[in-house]
């Protein structure tokens, strides 16, 4: 514990990589764990693919909403782990969070520099005209459409595309992640098994940066624990509470 506090105290530029384990204590399931959305029915991956959306946009949305309806309710709240990262920023540290989660809880906790690698469930855009929409509009109808008016006054009416990165979409912000990593003095990995590319390569690449400290906080061991200076096998909310963090 004291070693971790010392590492945090010395760090001024922190890159954080978070996964599903970051939000499980907020009530959001880990999709890839036992009983998760993908492990229960692998065919769901096909329905959540870019190809499926492009081919059947009106069939896509009911399936998408069924799978993610709990997340779209907006009822989930940040846990102590999210709040800990926001607090580090308040202390004057540069904290850049790169999350594989789509729940928006880092922003809800108050963190300002959040890069959503897999997009956000809170927003969508029109593939035709680029108009953007937030959650209330997406929930108004089973299949959300663009309501923007064109130059001729006609309503666009195109089926919106979620900002969630679908299977077949490109993961976002990885160039920015490596730019920030080159400037950082601490890599903090939280709640991810590091099994999914390209995130799985980050710890190894960080090991090549002179002076970089690396800490992982994850309930289960990962294949690359040996690359880290400190390994903590604990839930992040529980660990944050042990540091005195309260909701």
Curated annotation (Swiss-Prot):
The keyword Ribonucleoprotein does not apply. It is found in: Cytoplasm. Nicotinamide binds at residues 31, 102-103. It comes from the Bacteria. Residues 1-247 form the Deacetylase sirtuin-type domain. NAD(+) binds at residues 20, 24, 31-32, 100, 102-103, 118, 192-193, 218, 236. Binds 1 zinc ion per subunit. Zn(2+) binds at residues 126, 129, 146, 156. GO terms for molecular function: histone deacetylase activity, NAD-dependent; NAD+ binding; zinc ion binding. Signal peptide: none annotated. It holds the Pfam family SIR2. PANTHER family: NAD-DEPENDENT PROTEIN DEACYLASE, NAD-DEPENDENT PROTEIN DEACYLASE SIRTUIN-5, MITOCHONDRIAL-RELATED. NAD-dependent protein deacetylase which modulates the activities of several enzymes which are inactive in their acetylated form. This is NAD-dependent protein deacetylase. The gene is cobB.
């Amino acid at each position: 514990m004291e070693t971790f506090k010392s590492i945090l105290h010395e760090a001024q530029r922190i890159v954080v990589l978070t996964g599903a384990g970051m939000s499980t204590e907020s009530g959001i399931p880990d999709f890839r764990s036992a009983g998760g959305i993908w492990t229960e029915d692998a065919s769901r991956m096909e329905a959540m693919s870019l190809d499926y959306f492009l081919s059947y946009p009106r069939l896509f949305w009911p399936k998408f909403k069924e799978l993610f309806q709990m997340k779209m309710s907006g009822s989930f709240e940040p846990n102590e782990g999210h709040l800990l990262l926001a607090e580090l920023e308040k202390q004057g540290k540069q904290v850049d969070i790169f999350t594989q989660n789509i729940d928006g809880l880092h922003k809800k906790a108050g963190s300002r520099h959040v890069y959503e690698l897999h997009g956000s469930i809170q927003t969508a855009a029109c593939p035709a005209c680029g108009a953007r929409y937030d959650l209330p509009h997406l929930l108004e109808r089973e299949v959300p459409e663009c309501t923007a008016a064109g130059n001729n006054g006609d309503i666009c009416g195109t089926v919106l595309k979620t900002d969630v990165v679908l299977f077949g979409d490109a993961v976002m912000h990885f160039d920015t992640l490596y730019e920030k990593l080159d400037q950082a003095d601490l890599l903090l990995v939280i709640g991810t098994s590091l099994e999914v590319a390209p995130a799985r390569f980050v710890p190894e690449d960080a090991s090549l940066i002179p002076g970089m400290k690396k800490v992982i906080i994850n309930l289960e061991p990962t294949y690359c624990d040996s690359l880290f200076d400190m390994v903590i096998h604990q839930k992040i909310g529980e660990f944050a509470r042990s540091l005195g963090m309260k909701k």
